[in-house]
Design a protein with these regions (language model features):
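Residues forming the flavin
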Residues: 1-52, 58-429
Length: 432
């Protein structure tokens, strides 16, 4: 198997041109190319003066590989394809005495449960929120009627916070063992579009994610696992310094020496419980800021120039950063093309915002987080839970500023820069 990188074609090229370009790049006859797979497709729109092209990475099989490797020995864009297959790390023993427990059924909990089930461990997954379709109804209750269910909302429930976001599937974390390919293949197996396997910034979209996470849950169950909703963990069972299991809000105790805490970032009551039980934890840096919203057409024109609106490119995104002289950095985060700003709180009398896009990304406006990094050493000294306490103060203050009805306070950017209040907003698509 060979890999070609940096193979460029015009964005309007017919599908059959890709095979022809591979053959031409390698200098082989068409019948020598046995098969090829699209591994990645991206584009670079930074140079507005040049014609926009798709940039491909292709994995392929040829009739006689050795001569081609020798021929392109000095070409950094033609190499043996790396092995990106997932290597199973273990298998459950035949005499499995205790099933592992997974706490939380967001992205981490889903894949922890799925991988354990695939290895025969028959995990018990505990999720404090509801199954995804009932959770969706509760979430719309907050958006439309300002009625918050603290256990079923944007943060808690099947699929986790990512279900009501953009369904983004890319990360800046290096992945030398290609574990990300396993994740993408499992999503496709569960009903996500095939294109997430090769587009440079794959996303599924909120509405599609509901069916995908349901299918992944059914896979876990079919393999002998168990997924239980509305099961909030209130304590961990510890004897002689050894974990023995968990206790639920109902009083039920589940015993296991193996518990995975896939809590996400909003289970503050669970963090406090763990801290009180002597579980080691430390404060970490995080970022805080606001959501900015602007017309998607403005972003398309700025990023794509004359190609704005091209059907093969879709809605444009952006990523911006500013490094201030005082050492802090302000940057865009979780940019949602063609999406909406949504209320994302899970706690009474607090306001949190997030961004959300559907698969089509065809709403009028784009939005992004604009955040600044803060650290425990400078901004919230006082112990491992001091950052949570800072978040709670900010969220409570935002709740009051927004009218004490779960609507977020909003301000025009020009007014923010000028330091004056906003009296009227433009066209906005917000669920806050």
């Amino acid at each position: 198997m060979l890999r070609i990188t940096e193979l460029k074609l015009p964005i309007d090229h017919p599908d059959e041109d890709l095979r022809a370009a591979i053959v031409q790049r390698l200098g082989i006859a068409s019948d020598e190319l046995l098969d090829f797979t699209l591994f990645k497709r991206s584009y670079d729109a930074r140079k507005k003066s040049s014609e926009l092209c798709f940039i491909y990475t292709i994995d392929l099989s040829v009739r006689d590989e050795a001569p081609l490797l020798l021929k392109f020995a000095d070409d950094r864009n033609v190499n043996p394809a790396p092995d990106v297959s997932y290597k199973v790390v273990g298998q459950a023993p035949a005499n499995l005495s205790q099933r592992p427990i997974v706490v939380g059924f967001g992205p981490c909990g889903i894949f922890a449960g799925l991988l354990l089930a695939q290895m025969g461990f028959k995990p018990i997954v505990l999720e404090r929120g509801k199954e995804v379709r009932q959770r969706t109804k509760d979430t719309w209750g907050l958006w439309r009627k300002s009625v918050l269910n603290p256990e079923s909302n944007v943060q808690f429930g099947e699929g986790g916070a990512g279900t009501f976001s953009d369904g983004k599937l890319y990360s800046q974390i290096k992945d030398p063992q290609h574990h990300g390919r396993k994740v993408l293949h499992e999503f496709v197996k569960a009903g996500a579009p095939d294109e997430i396997l090769y587009v440079s910034k794959p996303h599924i979209g909120t509405f599609r994610l509901t069916g995908v996470v349901e299918n992944m849950r059914q896979q876990i169950i079919a393999l002998g696992g168990e997924v239980r909703f509305e099961q909030r963990v209130t304590d961990v069972l510890i004897e002689d310094g050894q974990l023995q299991g968990v206790e639920l809000a109902s009083g039920e105790q589940l015993h296991s020496r193996h518990v995975i805490l896939a809590l996400g970032h909003s289970a503050r009551d669970t963090f406090r419980m763990l801290h009180s039980r002597g579980v080691y934890m430390e404060a970490k840096p995080f970022s805080v800021g606001f959501r900015i919203e602007h017309p998607q057409s403005l972003i398309d024109s700025a990023r794509l120039g004359k190609y704005a609106g091209h059907p093969k490119l879709g809605a444009a995104d952006y990523k911006l950063v500013h490094h201030a002289k005082n050492g802090r950095s302000v940057y865009s985060f979780c940019m949602c093309p063609g999406g909406t700003v949504v209320a994302a709180t899970s706690e009474p009398n607090r306001v949190v915002t997030n961004g959300m896009s559907q698969y089509s990304r065809n709403e009028r406006n784009a939005n992004s987080g604009i955040v600044v990094g803060i650290t425990p050493e400078v901004d919230y000294p006082g112990g491992p839970l001091a950052g949570i306490e800072l978040q709670e103060r900010l969220e409570s203050h935002a709740f009051v500023l927004g009218g004490s009805n779960y609507q977020a306070p909003a301000q025009l950017v020009g007014d923010f820069i000028a330091g004056k209040p906003t009296t009227a907003l433009g066209l906005s698509l917000i669920h806050i």
